[in-house]
Regions:
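Transmembrane beta-strands of outer-membrane beta-barrel pores
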Residues: 15-21, 52, 68-74, 113, ...
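Membrane-embedded beta-strand positions of outer-membrane beta-barrel proteins
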Residues: 9-15, 62-66, 107, 121-125, ...
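Repeated loop/turn-to-beta-strand initiation elements of outer-membrane beta-barrel proteins
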Residues: 58-62, 117-121, 151-157, 163, ...
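Residues that define the transmembrane beta-barrel architecture of outer-membrane proteins
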Residues: 7, 40-48, 60, 99-105, ...
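Transmembrane beta-barrel domains of outer membrane proteins
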Residues: 49-55, 110-112, 144-148, 188-192
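Extracellular loop and loop/strand-boundary signature of outer-membrane beta-barrel proteins
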Residues: 31-38, 91-97, 129-132, 171-177
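Surface-exposed strand-loop-strand hairpins of Gram-negative outer-membrane beta-barrel proteins
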Residues: 18-47, 168
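Outer-membrane beta-barrel "beta-signal"
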Residues: 12, 16, 147-148, 179-196
Length: 196
């Protein structure tokens, strides 16, 4: 029987937390106003997509997930040095807080090992195109664990780490000078429609 004759597929939805990782760099001297620092926090991290599973009944099987993410990232932009001294008190610039809508479109391919009847582990890669706030490509590495609750429901927990310096492309608008990687931890539910 060919691989393509042994395909299971269905809807996948997920929600989780994101970890934008701000890269460090050498700070310029005190008083250089080009030196802004950033703190990032995901307020919303969700996705929806479709999964194709090849060789679903075998000990080793493969998943191909096509997903679209919906993320809201809150960024705090602040100046790490004191600006002045007033009445013996050091005064810093007021921090700016702004929100950005981040939309990644991803095609994730993973190799999976079923080590019990219900549980499996997987590793893979996820080429990702961010279409918001700016168009930029990233390549994530992925690790995941899954639990098959029933014939028509599976839970999964996955972690993805973006290999490229994606944040440097999000510097239009109120941000400038930031750089770093994007990663997230996602809990998902897979609902197969077609079982082979």
């Amino acid at each position: 029987t060919s691989t393509f004759a042994q395909i299971e597929h269905g809807l996948i939805v997920g929600a989780g937390v994101g970890f934008p990782l701000q890269a460090r760099w050498n700070r310029p001297p005190w008083g250089d106003e080009s030196n802004w620092s950033y703190r990032h926090d995901y307020k919303l991290n969700s996705m929806i997509g479709y999964r194709f599973r090849f060789l679903p009944e075998q000990k080793f099987f493969y998943d191909l997930d096509i997903t679209m993410g919906f993320q809201k990232m809150e960024t705090t932009k602040y100046f790490p040095y004191y600006e002045s001294i007033e009445d013996g008190i050091y005064v810093s610039k007021k921090a700016d807080v702004f929100d950005e809508f981040v939309m990644p479109i991803s095609v994730a391919a993973s190799w999976n090992w079923r080590f019990t009847k219900k549980f499996h582990l997987g590793v893979g890669i996820a080429p990702t195109l961010y279409v918001q706030p700016q168009a930029v490509f990233d390549l994530s590495v992925m690790a995941k664990v899954g639990y098959r609750l029933s014939k028509h429901c599976e839970f999964g927990l996955s972690y993805q780490y973006g290999c490229f310096n994606t944040l440097k492309h999000f510097n239009n608008g109120p941000a400038n000078g930031r750089r770093g990687h994007l990663s997230d931890l996602m809990l998902s539910v897979y609902v197969p429609f077609v079982l082979k």
